[in-house]
Amino acid sequence: VTAVKDVPADVLIAEVARYIKESVPQVRPPVWADCVKTGPNKTRPPADPDWWYVRAASVLRKLYLHGPAGVGRLRGAYSYRAKVGRYKTRPERTRKAGGAVIRKILQQLEQAGLVTRDKRGRSLTPEGRSLLDAIAAKIARELARARPELLKYTAPPRGQ
């Protein structure tokens, strides 16, 4: 069985983002999403017009691999190094990502039935886990078709 960690993260996140954009109507960028920054030390909003779906797919992957997690833990997961000081010459510091974007995405994923909330934070529902597993298996099959030496890492097709 192919798991999420068996396929490249960038390919998986792009495919899940495309699926969310096309098939999950509950996950939509709010009106303020086109002018919001993703962290306090960022100077501009993201350049990718579909960044909301990419971040939602990335949150799903992080919950699959490291869940359950809350907004604070995900803020730390999306943190970045920032230059500080008047002339930006002091050593860099870690800055946590903004919480509003992550919180709103988690709320939308809850409405879609892909994430559930409990006392330990948010975790994937069985539907969310099976969605990621199905997309990962599809990606693994496509990669194995492109590079036959990867066949040994995928399960044989049923009926053979």
Placement of each model-derived feature along the sequence:
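Long, low-complexity, charged/polar intrinsically disordered regions in eukaryotic proteins
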Residues: 1-57, 61
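Residue-level detection of the helix-turn-helix DNA-binding "recognition helix"
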Residues: 79, 107, 133, 137
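Short acidic, hydrophobic short linear motifs in intrinsically disordered regions
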Residues: 68-93
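Short amphipathic alpha-helical elements of helix-turn-helix/winged-helix folds
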Residues: 58-66, 77
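Short, hydrophobic-biased segments on the C-terminal half of alpha helices
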Residues: 71, 102-107
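Short, amphipathic alpha-helical interaction segments positioned at domain boundaries
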Residues: 126-160
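A short, conserved structural fragment
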Residues: 107-120
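Long, charge-rich, low-complexity intrinsically disordered regions
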Residues: 25-27, 49, 76, 94, ...
